[in-house]
C-alpha cells in the first residue's frame, strides 16, 4: 500500500527526531571525556589546588567545578544507556530467568553511580555558582556532609564493578561458580542499602 504524503512526512519527522535524540545523547556522553580535561587544565594552571575534597571556602576556578559536572552528566547518561540496554535485553528474551550474576553486580554499580552523581550535583552545582559569583556562600558543614555522600560512594562503584569482573573471570577462565548465587545477590543488595553508613568516618575524622 502507498503511504499518503502526511504519513511520509510524519515518518520523516520521526526519523529526524530520533537521529537528533541519539546525536544529543552521544554529545552528552562525550562530556564524560571533556569534563576531566577541563578539570586537569584548571589544576595545571595553578589556581585550583584544592585537592580531592575541594572543601569550601577553599575555592577553585569555575572550570574545575564545571569539569566535574560535565563528567557527571556523561556518566549519568552512560548509566541510563546501560539500564535501557537491560530493558531491551529483557524484551528480546536474551536470557532466561533473572539476569546473570555478573550483570546483577553491574546493576549494583550503576545504581550506586546514579546516587553518587545525584549527591554530587546537589552540592557541586551550588559550588560552581559560588565560583562564578552568582550566589554569596555555601555552608561548609553542609558541603562536607553532602560531598562525602558523593565522595565515599564514588569509590564503591569501583568495588562493585571489580567484584562483578572477578565473578566473570572466574567463570570464563576456570568454569567456577559461586557457592550460592542467592547469597551473592543478597550481598550486592545489602551493599546498596547500607553503603552510606560507612561514609561517617570521613565526616568524623
Go through each PLM region and give its residues:
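Membrane-embedded and interfacial regions of multi-pass energy-transducing membrane proteins
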Residues: 1-205
Amino acid at each position: 500500500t502507498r503511504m499518503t504524503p502526511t504519513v511520509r512526512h510524519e515518518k520523516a519527522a520521526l526519523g529526524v527526531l530520533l537521529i537528533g535524540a541519539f546525536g544529543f545523547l552521544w554529545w552528552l556522553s562525550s562530556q564524560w571525556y571533556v569534563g576531566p580535561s577541563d578539570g586537569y587544565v584548571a589544576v595545571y594552571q595553578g589556581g585550583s589546588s584544592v585537592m580531592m575534597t575541594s572543601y569550601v571556602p577553599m575555592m577553585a576556578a569555575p572550570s574545575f567545578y564545571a569539569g566535574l559536572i560535565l563528567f557527571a552528566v556523561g556518566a549519568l547518561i552512560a548509566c541510563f544507556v546501560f539500564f535501557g540496554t537491560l530493558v531491551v535485553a529483557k524484551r528480546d528474551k536474551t536470557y532466561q530467568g533473572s539476569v546473570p550474576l555478573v550483570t546483577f553486580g553491574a546493576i549494583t554499580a550503576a545504581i550506586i553511580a546514579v546516587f553518587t552523581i545525584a549527591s554530587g550535583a546537589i552540592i557541586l552545582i551550588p559550588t560552581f555558582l559560588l565560583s562564578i559569583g552568582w550566589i554569596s556562600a555555601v555552608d561548609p558543614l553542609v558541603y562536607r556532609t553532602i560531598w562525602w555522600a558523593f565522595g565515599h560512594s564514588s569509590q564503591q562503584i569501583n568495588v562493585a564493578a571489580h567484584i562483578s569482573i572477578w565473578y566473570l573471570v572466574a567463570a570464563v577462565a576456570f568454569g567456577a561458580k559461586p557457592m550460592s548465587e542467592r547469597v551473592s545477590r543478597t550481598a550486592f543488595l545489602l551493599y546498596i542499602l547500607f553503603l552510606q553508613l560507612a561514609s561517617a568516618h570521613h565526616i568524623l575524622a
